[in-house]
Amino acid sequence: GSIVMNEQDISRLDDTGRAAVRRSNLGIIFQQFNLIPSLDVAANIAFQARLAGMYDADSATGLAQALGLADHLHKFPEQLSGGQQQRVAIARALAAKPSLILADEPTGNLDEATAAEVMAQMLALVTKTGAALVMVTHSPRLAGQMGRQLHLRQGQLA
């Protein structure tokens, strides 16, 4: 088999080539945020984009503003609420302008009200950028906001 992303067969690439494709084409949002504790919000947002050679200060600032983080750019993750940390993780995932975003339970650690707010912001930004979003969630409410749903039951697509 093969894996084609943006018209490129990535299954034929070596490890270095696949890593380059991941850095420049994938944005990943983890349930546990996975922010770098020693970096402030601005540096956490910029991290992935810098690795991909795609850093744009204006774009990063725009993401921070769109996610309500403009007043928190010089704070460290431990100084932020869970919702703010997840917003940083979303901004980081979008900063390199990926074509595909993988989100693993992106609101799983948030209360219902914060989850709804963060999800609305994330979906608006994903729509604006034109990226595809693949999200794993146990929440029927969140799944209902997606254009297409696939259900996994006992390891099989149902």
Where are these regions (language model features)?
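ABC family nucleotide-binding domain
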Residues: 1-145, 149
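H-loop (His-switch) and adjacent beta-strand-loop-beta switch element
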Residues: 146-158
